[in-house]
Amino acid sequence: MRAAFIILIGGLSCLAISCAKDSPQPASIPGQLTDIPEGFDEIKYPSGNEFNMARWMLGKRLFFDPILSADGNVSCGSCHKPHLAFSDDVAFSPGANGAPGTRNAPSLANVAYHPYFTREGGVPTLEMQILVPIQEHNEFNTNIVELAEILSKDQSYIEMSQAAYERNPDPYVITRAIANFERTLISGNSAFDQYYYLGNKMALSSVQKIGLDLFFGKANCSSCHGGFNFTQYAFENNGLYESFDDPGRFRLNRDSADLSRFKVPSLRNVALTAPYMHDGSLLSLTDVVEHYNEGGKNHPNKSSQIKPLHLSEGEVIALVSFLEGLTDYSFITNKLLQP
């Protein structure tokens, strides 16, 4: 059960879809995979898992291969769809054999910059996070050791693994290859980026510019969603409910101050990632803005930042329009990142 495993390394969904059985040869590195957007930090690859095309190609194949799941039908890409900025459009993504999920699948865009993983931050590295969906009963419901044995019977996977890490498929290879691929899911070419970082003053509409001023000003969204990735990675209770079914970070550390506090998500590509919140309970961006405009519901751990905003109807529209301007269409149409 997820709650039991979270104490060890946490939870989050991975992704999937089937790939060709042929073993492709590593090619030269396309610029789209390594270029860092203006205003972004450099990506830090861990020692022993630095980027190269052999690792990336293996990771991509594994990411979209449903062989990772017990029933052979669910992959990382099943819950993290490229055209949705590697998120899903349902409240809870089904796992192997249709097992119901318990949390909304977050976007994986810019996951390379996250300092910890899962909604309660219980996993310190991207490589470790890969283990979570593999063994969760309501996700892949399998075992990484058994999975490695299955992959070791596939000659094409053996060849790709040797090219990438000079060893046959094993838990080390599986976790590192998928993480290597996921670190290239970089999104930083939205209308906002063109306006703010590249100086194209026509990139945002007049309404979106009003929304931008609200975001960083009156609405103070940037207090939680600041920085180039539109998150400070803090843990907050946003007053979604007076009583939450999900204990949030509390189930990791048993600290009552963390009851129903969750990691603040990035807002990049947020127009594509509905439904919203940890449980997918809000269906539209307007619903989200109205929730914060009303100041949320009473909860003893509600963030002090959550208070009535007193936005007019026109200001709500402008703020939503600005959030739509965070969509990176080049990211979601990049064929290199698709199956």
Could you describe each region identified by the protein language model?
Residues 1-26:
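Bacterial Sec-dependent N-terminal signal peptides
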Residues 19-339:
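Periplasmic c-type cytochrome electron-transfer domains
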